[in-house]
């Protein structure tokens, strides 16, 4: 069993936004089981939002598997202070571990997790393997929802590969930080994969948000996040995210308790 830390409740508005997102996803239809969360660039809040939604589904009695599919640069183990050396997705996809060996129960209600595993130099090739498809088909028989946290899609192809195995996708957009054109690029990639776009979460709405910590950690956004994969894009594009009525979703309040140090 994985013992997770830093999972306490956020502020009231954050919790209500996550409940709204959960309800909207339920309204999308009973056939929706595998849902991916992605973003254009690192640090838009997708990993925290995916975790919060998975936890929220668990709280209402749904059995949920949260899959950390960001094999390049995961944040889950560090953020939730997971101890030991747990197996992960990269080991399963490379044939080192079985599916049973990478699925972990957690100390949270109805929530199991698959962690990313050790860094792999060729994650796109691993994700394209038949083993990933087999895994998704197998866990669909067990869980009510499979929530997949994917890498940001502006720089690498991993997210589009994962999307081809998902029933729906949610794009997380940091308010005021990502251009409309860049979000449309992600949207186009998802459409080409055949994945249904459920909508978007407009994250960190209202107030200013300090980027200096993240620029120091990641370089200038994508440039250092993926090494050679990110240099093509360099610094993230200036501009504002699309209005919420252009890509429907939950507004998550910008508050110190709701901000995520996230990819």
Specify the residue positions occupied by each region the protein language model found.
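P-loop NTP-binding module
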Residues: 3-263
